[in-house]
Regions:
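C-terminal capping alpha-helices of c-type cytochrome domains
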Residues: 17, 22, 94-97, 102-107, ...
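The canonical Cys-X-X-Cys-His
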Residues: 29, 35-45, 55, 135, ...
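Bacterial N-terminal signal peptides
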Residues: 1-9
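Electrostatic cytochrome c docking/interface patches
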Residues: 13-34, 49-53, 63-66, 90-94, ...
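Structured surface patches comprising rigid loops and adjacent beta-strands/short helices at the edges
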Residues: 114-115, 119-134
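Extracytoplasmic/periplasmic beta-strand context in beta-sandwich domains
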Residues: 30, 53, 83-85, 133
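Sec-exported extracytoplasmic/periplasmic mature domains
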Residues: 34-37, 46, 60, 72, ...
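Short Fe-S-cluster ligation motifs
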Residues: 68-89
């Protein structure tokens, strides 16, 4: 009986939290994405950088709840393919970027300048996966309505026949 009440209580809490989230407007969300530096890291269709995850079909891959969570707490769940690395060369130069590929001999990444770079492991003094991503939280910077609008826009981005990977 206690377990049933706890389950019912948590379901009621989730329903209340969902009711507290305003309905989003995808058109306003698109305007917000276009005006808030999202394209500095993300790509949608043929626009933007490849530094961060491609959002062209994000609505096919993530629920609205997960999209909202990624906006307000981006470091809570970073997919392995979106992790950043820090390389230090034997000459002391530090390079950061999103890891694309690695093998026993080389490391390939996309730099913040959207450049594809390959480094030989023999030329590196250090190779480290960065604990946090570059994505800033929008919490406290955007209103709940603006966040809901962005979520509505991102949720509307579905896969196309031409594909949308990378």
């Amino acid at each position: 009986m206690v377990a049933v009440c706890a389950i019912a209580g948590s379901a009621a809490l989730r329903a209340q939290q969902a009711a507290d989230v305003p309905a989003g407007d995808a058109a306003r969300g698109r305007t917000l994405v276009e005006s808030n530096q999202c394209f500095d890291c993300h790509r949608i269709a043929d626009r933007g950088s490849r530094l961060g995850p491609n959002l062209s079909d994000i609505g096919s891959r993530r629920t609205p709840d997960r999209l909202r969570q990624a906006l307000v707490a981006p470091d809570e769940e970073v997919a392995p393919e979106n992790r950043f690395v820090r390389l230090v060369t034997k000459q002391g130069a530090t390079i950061t970027g999103r890891l694309l590929n690695q093998d026993s001999f080389s490391v390939q990444l996309i730099t913040p300048k959207d450049e594809l770079k390959t480094y030989m492991r023999a030329a590196l003094r250090e190779f480290a996966i960065v604990d946090k991503g570059l994505m800033p939280t929008v919490e406290g910077k955007l209103t709940d309505q603006q966040i809901a609008d962005i979520v509505a826009y991102l949720a509307s981005l579905k896969a196309t026949s031409t594909g949308a990977s990378y």
